[in-house]
């Protein structure tokens, strides 16, 4: 899974950096709130599933929240940005979907400054 990255167009990256920073700030504010209140998170997950046509229970949603926690802003500061992208790239090479010689190019497209700016580090 791409747990440490956002994929954006060149236009958004070059012309709307402020929006990307604000999006990341809002994303982590939401993650912090949801991780800080598991009951609220479970209820919101139940509401989302219900609104999208799935049947579940509050208890099942609470279990899902327990087993798949939200990454908080503090935890994010310890994550190596782009790590999951490299793992995906390695998989692509193993499946012959990417030439091994092109694998190093992946790192050139990872920029951690937006997250660092959003989280203040």
Q: What does each model-identified segment do?
A:
Residues 2-19:
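A bilobed periplasmic-binding-protein/Venus flytrap-type ligand-binding module shared by bacterial periplasmic
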Residues 3, 10, 62, 67-68, ...:
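Generic secondary-structure boundary/loop-capping signal
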Residues 10-13, 76, 118-121:
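Short, structured secondary-structure boundary patches
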Residues 14-97:
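Secondary-structure end/capping motifs
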Residues 86-121:
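Conserved C-terminal helix/tail region of periplasmic/extracytoplasmic solute-binding proteins
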């Amino acid at each position: 899974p791409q747990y440490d990255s956002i994929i954006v167009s060149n236009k958004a990256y070059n012309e709307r950096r402020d929006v990307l920073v604000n999006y990341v700030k809002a994303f982590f504010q939401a993650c912090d709130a949801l991780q800080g209140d598991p009951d609220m998170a479970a209820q919101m997950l139940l509401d989302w599933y219900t609104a999208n046509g799935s049947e579940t229970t509050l208890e099942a949603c609470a279990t899902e929240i327990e087993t798949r926690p939200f990454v908080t802003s503090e935890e994010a500061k310890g994550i190596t940005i782009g790590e999951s992208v490299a793992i995906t790239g390695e998989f692509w090479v193993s499946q012959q979907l990417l030439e091994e010689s092109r694998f190093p190019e992946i790192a050139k497209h990872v920029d951690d400054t937006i997250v660092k700016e959003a989280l203040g580090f």
